[in-house]
């Protein structure tokens, strides 16, 4: 497999032993392997970033989608990885550095007020919005026991504001992908419909 390839190992996370575990660890530490849920790769595939694009990953930490976008860009273009939560920026920087792509820049802004850089707008914007995570039951089985209808409603306005800003800073003819890991239509379809 080459750059940008995806595969699923024949064992569960944490089950690798001995030499296999050491090889996987070394590949991860040198940026040649990034662990990510297969479903989490779909927004970047939908984004369709290409060599030379200027891309904004608006809600980027921990950086798995950022590095996946960088794979699409090769050595030409830019993915600007933004994270509003200061305590998560270090993880984003670390993962971006580990990947080693010259195309990744990291910034710390509130995505609702993201500056338009470049002035002509971004070619592509990924809004992987903060959400309730109600769609992560496969890896987090206790999600439904804690789920409340008010959760999605409490995030809806923020999600609308993030997507609205993405529309403003994307150049004409560009592409925006809005994604959550929620099954709640208040966080998904209702956000897109409102914007």
Question: What spans do the regions from the language model cover?
Answer:
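S-adenosylmethionine
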Residues: 1-195
